[in-house]
């Protein structure tokens, strides 16, 4: 039996972020829809060809998305929120962008769809909205059009479709509450129609993604799989596809399904391959996700060969990426500045395709030459284990010396709050922002010129100082109470810290999609982490010298730096987080010495770091909270520690949020209409809270009345004396005109509420 290989998906954005540039040009009115569509066509054709040339047997089609693949699925099913619908019920690419960005068909603002993390990754999807009695129809034929495109280009393909149960699981009920699973029978006819269309095109296999099967699903959701897949069987072969964790706990449900194959993630999952093989119907195809789609490390192909060889010829077998390569940068060959040793440890999406091809060839026709090729390929990643670039004895000693006293503040919150009130004397409903201000073309140009050597250090610092001065002046003029320096010097909240810490390396083109047109370039953690010198102190001290009002020191927390980097795989995540915490603990101490009295330690990724299964949560939360406290607890009692979290659902982790013992927490709540505050109310959260009062991901400017209404809603749940007033998130991606207007409205809303209290 010949083994084939395939990928579950490929990065969409393009090596030079061509998709991002085309999207933003179109949104700004600088290019036509046809020009945008052409960029998409060119990228798809290039990516299919590149995968095929790298040795991929079946290229995925349907993994491309103009904004997000879950949103694409919503449109496929005709699921468009009423506020975004065209008058004639038609669906086009503008419908898709309106849902993602927040505009009505008239051009007036309409709330964007809620956005949240895709399982435990750094990718965001647009949350489908469901209403009772909703109608579904095949509304958007992007998948079929792209299948036609790929077939016309002569590719051997495997269409990709998000499965019906995972799709419903990922959504939220809007309006009157009901069980969204009850919509299953309404969406299945659309899936049947799509599969019938694919069958007409001669498609043999369809990858139907059901990553919800790695979760601990309620029994009624598990029970829904059998009738759902009964309804979908017969027209094409279905490869039931799971990723991000193991499936052993749901194996009884899975093996009874009328599908022809199963894909499992054997990188993130811990399923025993022999047990899996034994438990599955013998005629099923088993696709093994052996190449990590979520990290940048070269695979040890020799080890995989040894592990997989016993399965060869025992059943139909495919090899694949563990998950979509969406989460990987595209091409390591474009990296010209990486040190040769470090570069030899990496593999990006195209190299991962080549790894699949190499391993498949060796398993199909093992001989000495092939095995030697695998050994030569695997040698650098094996040599890394003993590299001096990886190990730092001093860091290891410091980690071993941590005691329980190192992670506790000196006084409890109530006593600290009193000393902080005396020190800062802030008004009721204090206003602040989350940290960053608009990153103008001028700011980005300044950083780029400095990075590429066109600008010397002195002139760079002068330029950044001017932007900080402007940010402070703007905030003074607006009447904000606690200021920030605006982060003009920072390219990215994680990359900036990584650049100043030992143990990290950076890529030139290692872009991955975060959401919509937003791309990030995660640092890579290659070894033990330490801080050679202060990182943020110079700019924080300068900003504070410009104003009598308190200026926040701004740090990215240890868990977020870990979650938003490509981590090492040779030590635990806990070890990495605590190494970062120790480095940033020194930064907190230095900020205090420089006179900074309010220090924000952002942990937007705390929740997304949760393991997918609850059974594993407690261990993670314990070390994640300890890492934050290790970072913060060095602060004096009159230093106010803030933290910021976004895209979070808090209900199930409130104990841990409270255990962080931050003096103030700011959270993203506007898109969920203050829903998140219910968790804090039910828990009787003891410290101060800044619920985000407007959505910075949308260009819409909130009215004073809108903000006031949200704050009143917040005050029904949290005592007003413990409420802060702030946007949802940093303002880096917004323009100055809308930022000024939105913040002016926010300050005015706070002032009105203060006046009511007098």
UniProtKB/Swiss-Prot annotation:
The annotation note on the cofactor reads: Binds 1 zinc ion per subunit.
The Gene Ontology biological process terms listed for this entry are: methionine biosynthetic process; methylation
Residues binding 5-methyltetrahydropteroyltri-L-glutamate are: 17-20, 117, 518-519, 564, 608
Residues annotated as binding L-methionine are 434-436, 487, 602
A Pfam match is: Meth_synt_2
Please name the catalytic residues of this protein: 697
Q: Which CDD domains match?
A: CIMS_C_terminal_like, CIMS_N_terminal_like
Pathway assignment reads:
Amino-acid biosynthesis; L-methionine biosynthesis via de novo pathway; L-methionine from L-homocysteine (MetE route): step 1/1
Tell me the Gene3D superfamilies matching this sequence: 3.20.20.210
Query: Source organism's superkingdom?
Result: Bacteria
GO MF terms listed in the record are: 5-methyltetrahydropteroyltriglutamate-homocysteine S-methyltransferase activity; zinc ion binding
Q: Kindly state which reaction or reactions the protein catalyses.
A: 5-methyltetrahydropteroyltri-L-glutamate + L-homocysteine = tetrahydropteroyltri-L-glutamate + L-methionine
Cofactor dependence: Zn(2+)
- Positions binding Zn(2+) in this chain are 644, 646, 668, 729
Question: Which key words tag this protein in UniProt?
Answer: Amino-acid biosynthesis, Metal-binding, Methionine biosynthesis, Methyltransferase, Repeat, Transferase, Zinc
**Function field:** Catalyzes the transfer of a methyl group from 5-methyltetrahydrofolate to homocysteine resulting in methionine formation.
Q: To which protein family does this belong?
A: Belongs to the vitamin-B12 independent methionine synthase family.
HAMAP family documented for this protein: Meth_synth (MF_00172)
Q: What is this protein called?
A: 5-methyltetrahydropteroyltriglutamate--homocysteine methyltransferase
Gene from which this protein is expressed: metE
């Amino acid at each position: 039996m010949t083994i084939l290989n395939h990928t579950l998906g490929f990065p969409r954005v393009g090596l030079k972020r061509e998709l991002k540039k085309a999207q933003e040009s179109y949104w700004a009115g600088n290019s036509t829809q046809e020009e945008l569509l052409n960029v998409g066509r060119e990228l798809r054709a290039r990516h299919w060809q590149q995968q095929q040339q790298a040795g991929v047997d079946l290229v995925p089609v349907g993994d491309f998305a103009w904004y997000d693949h879950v949103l694409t699925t919503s449109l496929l099913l005709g699921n468009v929120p009423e506020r975004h619908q065209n008058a004639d019920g038609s669906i086009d690419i503008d419908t898709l962008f309106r849902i993602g960005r927040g505009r009505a068909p008239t051009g007036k603002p309409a709330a964007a769809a809620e956005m949240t993390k895709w399982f435990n990754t750094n990718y965001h999807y647009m949350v489908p909205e469901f209403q009772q009695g909703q109608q579904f129809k095949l509304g958007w034929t992007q998948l079929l059009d792209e299948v036609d495109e790929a077939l016309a280009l002569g590719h051997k393909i495997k269409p990709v479709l998000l499965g019906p149960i995972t799709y419903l699981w990922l959504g939220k009920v809007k309006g009157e509450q009901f069980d969204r699973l009850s919509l299953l029978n309404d969406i299945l006819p659309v899936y049947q129609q799509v599969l019938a269309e694919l069958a007409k095109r001669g498609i043999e296999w369809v990858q139907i993604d059901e990553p919800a099967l790695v979760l601990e699903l309620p029994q009624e959701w598990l029970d829904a799989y059998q009738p759902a897949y009964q309804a979908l069987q017969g027209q094409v072969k279905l490869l039931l596809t799971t990723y991000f964790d193991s499936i052993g706990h749901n194996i009884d449900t899975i093996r009874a399904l009328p599908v022809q194959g199963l894909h499992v993630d054997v990188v993130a999952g811990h399923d025993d391959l022999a047990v899996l093989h034994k438990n599955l119907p013998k005629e099923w195809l088993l696709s093994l996700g052996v190449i990590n789609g979520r990290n940048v490390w070269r695979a040890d192909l020799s080890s995989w060969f040894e592990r997989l060889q016993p399965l060869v010829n025992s059943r139909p077998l495919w090899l694949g990426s563990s998950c979509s390569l969406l989460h990987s940068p595209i091409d390591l060959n474009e990296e010209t500045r990486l040190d040769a040793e470090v570069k030899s440890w990496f593999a990006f999406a195209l190299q991962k395709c080549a790894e699949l091809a190499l391993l498949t060839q060796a398993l199909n026709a093992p001989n000495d030459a092939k095995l030697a090729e695998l050994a030569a390929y695997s040698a650098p990643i094996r040599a890394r284990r003993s590299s001096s670039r990886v190990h730092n004895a001093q860091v290891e000693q410091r980690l071993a010396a941590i005691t329980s006293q190192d992670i506790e503040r000196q006084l409890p919150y109530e006593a600290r709050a009193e000393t902080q009130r005396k020190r800062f004397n802030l008004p009721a409903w204090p206003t602040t922002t989350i940290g960053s201000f608009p990153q103008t073309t001028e700011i980005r140009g300044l950083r780029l010129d400095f990075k590429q050597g066109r600008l010397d250090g002195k002139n760079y610092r002068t330029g950044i100082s001017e932007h900080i001065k402007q940010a402070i002046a703007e905030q003074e003029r607006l009447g904000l109470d606690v200021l920030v320096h605006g982060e003009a010097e920072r390219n990215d909240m994680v990359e900036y810290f990584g650049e100043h810490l030992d143990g990290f390396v950076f890529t030139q083109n290692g872009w991955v999609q975060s959401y919509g047109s937003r791309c990030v370039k995660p640092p890579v953690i290659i070894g033990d982490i330490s801080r050679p010198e202060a990182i943020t102190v110079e700019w924080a001290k300068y900003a504070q010298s410009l104003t009598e009002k308190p200026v926040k020191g701004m740090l990215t927390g240890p868990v977020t730096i870990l979650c938003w980097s490509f981590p090492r795989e040779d030590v635990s995540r806990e070890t990495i987080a605590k190494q970062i915490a120790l480095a940033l603990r020194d930064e907190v101490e230095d900020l205090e010495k420089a006179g900074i009295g309010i220090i924000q330690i952002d942990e937007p990724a705390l929740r997304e770091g949760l393991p997918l299964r609850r059974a594993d949560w407690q261990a993670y939360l314990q070390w994640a909270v300890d890492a934050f406290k290790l970072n913060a607890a060095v602060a004096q009692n009159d230093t106010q520690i803030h933290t910021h979290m976004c895209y979070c659902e808090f209900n199930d982790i409130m104990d841990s949020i409270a255990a962080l013992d931050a003096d103030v927490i700011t959270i993203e709540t506007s898109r969920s209409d203050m829903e998140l505050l219910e968790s804090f109310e039910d828990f009787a959260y003891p410290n101060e809270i800044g619920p985000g009062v407007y959505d910075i991901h949308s260009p819409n400017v909130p009215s004073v009345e809108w903000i006031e209404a949200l704050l009143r809603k917040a005050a029904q749940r949290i005592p007003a004396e413990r409420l802060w007033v702030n946007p949802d998130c940093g303002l880096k991606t917004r323009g100055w005109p809308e930022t000024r207007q939105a913040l002016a409205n926010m300050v005015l809303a706070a002032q009105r509420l203060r006046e009511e209290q007098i």
